[in-house]
Amino acid sequence: MARALLFSLVFLAILLPALAACPQNCHCHGDLQHVICDKVGLQKIPKVSETTKLLNLQRNNFPVLAANSFRTMPNLVSLHLQHCNIREVAAGAFRGLKQLIYLYLSHNDIRVLRAGAFDDLTELTYLYLDHNKVSELPRGLLSPLVNLFILQLNNNKIRELRAGAFQGAKDLRWLYLSENALSSLQPGSLDDVENLAKFHLDKNQLSSYPSAALSKLRVVEELKLSHNPLKSIPDNAFQSFGRYLETLWLDNTNLEKFSDAAFSGVTTLKHVHLDNNRLNQLPSSFPFDNLETLTLTNNPWKCTCQLRGLRRWLEAKASRPDATCSSPAKFKGQRIRDTDALRSCKSPTKRSKKAGRH
């Protein structure tokens, strides 16, 4: 009898995690592997089965995520905490979540991310922190995130990127910093994420192109700098990743000029957005060879022979942008692709291939 009772107790102990109850007012699926507690009035993190892999806690109220808030959920893969009025994430808040891949913290009131907030998240691949009030990234904050691939930090209040901000996140590929308050990227701030492929910096306050910081990047395919008061782009701006750059957004920047060698080393550019600026010329280094899309409208283009490369590109395209001349006066309002201003322009003398090799 005693042996039978002992066997029963052991059996129940083994099954207990799988038989744990679904939290009140929540919906559970797949033997409690998916727990949905969306907008159910929770004030504290509920207890769930150790077998739970997806926990959706959206639209509840957790002002502070304290240390060890999820320690009893070692098998979580996806954690949803959007719209939860979170103000602070304490050090060790996600301790124990060594299987977590997706973490959603979007649309909260997060102002403080303590160093150590992401400890133990060594498998985390997707981190969404957009639409919060984060003003700085403490050095070492991302150090545990050795597998991070996508980081969304858009729509926050970050003013500056300092050296070491992304320390440890060496595999980061997509970084979104749109709609912050960035006025500068310090030299060294991107040294730890040289493998970025997609980098969005639009709608910030960058008054000069951050050459020193960006020069550490090697494989950027898409760079978005729209809606920054840039005015000019310097020589060799994209050279360190010029063999990979395919899409460049520089619209709505009050851009007045490119330096002559701004596009030096750029060989694969396919899509460029330059509309709503103050440009009147394009540099001789502008890479038309592989270009598929070019937006040009609302710029005061000066229709002289310096635009002959643009004219040739426009003539070769079936779908062509409708940019017009602003000067000389007699050509004002004429489409660049049709104006007589460029008809007599001769092609520049090509340098020999031998002379052009490096």
UniProtKB/Swiss-Prot annotation:
Glycans are attached at S143. The keyword Repeat applies. Residues 348-358 have a biased composition (Basic residues). GO terms for cellular component: extracellular region. Cartilage. SMART domains: LRR_TYP (SM00369), LRRCT (SM00082), LRRNT (SM00013). Disulfide bonds join C22-C37, C303-C345, C305-C325. Residues 1-20 form the signal peptide. It comes from the Eukaryota. Residues 322-358 are annotated as: Disordered. The keyword Disulfide bond applies. Mostly monomeric. Interacts with collagen type II. PANTHER family: ANTIGEN BSP, PUTATIVE-RELATED, CHAOPTIN-RELATED. This is Chondroadherin. The gene is Chad.
